[in-house]
């Protein structure tokens, strides 16, 4: 009999890739989201469109004992969405409600194996002030002081899943994602992450033109390609690791240098102009010590390789949109 998996947030970037991976493993997969993925048809055997904030809907889709449940659904976006302050209440309310509903429904169905996608945004701001030496080791999460309400909600929900482990005998797993990117992800509209934003700006910019980058461009981040993320997610889900664990790359890069990488990939001659704008913490980089020790896992490719794939896909999307406008 086929194993059965549920992917919440299956219409999103990571969720869509995860559905495909699970199908390739031979799972029967149900996906659920507010919408279908706008860039590719779903590979799910069953796809339910609905609102995970609604308890009755959640109960209707968690109607059996799934072997694995992946809870990736959240109200999220890039710096332009998270750090303005205008979306704080929605972000906290919507994501917390989704997690409460999904986890309770899983518990009532006696589902043990639930994966929760947390984020590096839950790390304390005071440990990420130095762009050259950020501290994002898992044990540095407390004393807590995330730089956004998005991060605070992630921290709350981590504790929620771990509390269900302790009190109700569940086997929830928590992965802290560090800036996942790649094809089939949001690339415009304000919710895109930095790699997609840079690829879009460069793809749309004429040769000899100029792109804008928020802040001084010296803020640092690390970025993980989607295929690597899915591999680590599956490994953590099926491991005995009880604590939250980083899923990211240790290849740190300044945002200006990320823009320069996209420019170099394009082959264009483009200049960069730094402008005021939301930029988040000064430095953030995944510390992969735990996942390396526990699972012998590390990214298999450098950032440049993933950026080349992302640029190719986003450049094609820009061309398609331009043709549709004409």
Residue ranges and their predicted role:
Residues 5-25:
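N-terminal Rossmann NAD(P)H-binding glycine-rich loop of SDR-like oxidoreductase domains
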Residues 27-36:
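Conserved glycine-rich Rossmann-like NAD(P)H-binding loop of the short-chain dehydrogenase/reductase
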Residues 43-54:
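Rossmann-fold cofactor-recognition segment
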Residues 52-95, 108:
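NAD(P)H-binding glycine-rich loop region in Rossmannoid oxidoreductase-like domains
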Residues 100-147:
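Conserved Rossmann-fold NAD(P)-dependent oxidoreductase catalytic core, especially the SDR/UDP-sugar
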Residues 126-135, 159-237, 250-252, 259-266:
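NAD(P)-dependent short-chain dehydrogenase/reductase
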Residues 149, 153:
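Active-site helix of classical SDR
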Residues 204-326:
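C-terminal substrate-binding subdomain of Rossmann-fold SDR/epimerase-dehydratase oxidoreductases
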């Amino acid at each position: 009999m086929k194993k059965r998996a549920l992917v919440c947030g299956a219409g999103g970037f990571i969720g869509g890739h995860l559905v495909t991976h699970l199908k390739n493993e031979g799972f029967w997969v149900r996906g659920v989201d507010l919408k279908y993925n706008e860039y590719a048809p779903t590979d799910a055997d069953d796809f339910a469109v609905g609102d995970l904030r609604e308890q009755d809907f959640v109960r209707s889709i968690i109607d059996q004992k799934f072997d694995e449940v992946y809870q990736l659904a959240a109200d999220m976006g890039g710096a332009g969405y998270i750090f303005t302050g205008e979306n704080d209440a929605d972000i906290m309310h919507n994501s917390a409600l989704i997690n409460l509903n999904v986890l309770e429904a899983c518990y009532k169905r006696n589902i043990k194996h639930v994966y929760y996608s947390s984020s590096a945004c839950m790390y304390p701001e005071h440990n990420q002030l130095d762009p050259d030496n950020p501290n994002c080791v898992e044990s540095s999460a407390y004393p807590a002081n995330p730089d956004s309400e998005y991060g605070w909600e992630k921290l709350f929900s981590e504790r929620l899943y771990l509390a269900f482990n302790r009190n109700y005998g569940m086997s929830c797993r928590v992965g802290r994602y560090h800036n996942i990117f790649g094809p089939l992800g949001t690339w415009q509209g304000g919710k895109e992450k930095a790699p997609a934003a840079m690829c879009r700006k460069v793809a749309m910019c004429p040769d000899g033109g100029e792109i804008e980058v928020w802040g001084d461009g010296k803020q640092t981040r690390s970025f993980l390609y989607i295929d690597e993320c899915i591999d680590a997610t599956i490994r953590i889900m099926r491991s005995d690791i009880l604590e939250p664990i980083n899923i990211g790359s240790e290849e740190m890069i300044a945002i200006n240098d990320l823009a320069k990488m996209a420019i170099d990939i394009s082959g264009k001659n483009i200049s960069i102009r730094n402008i005021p704008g939301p930029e988040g913490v000064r430095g953030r980089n995944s510390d992969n010590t735990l996942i390396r020790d526990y699972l012998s896992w590390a990214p298999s490719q450098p950032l440049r390789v993933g950026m080349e794939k992302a640029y190719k896909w986003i450049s094609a999307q820009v061309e398609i949109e331009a043709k549709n406008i004409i």
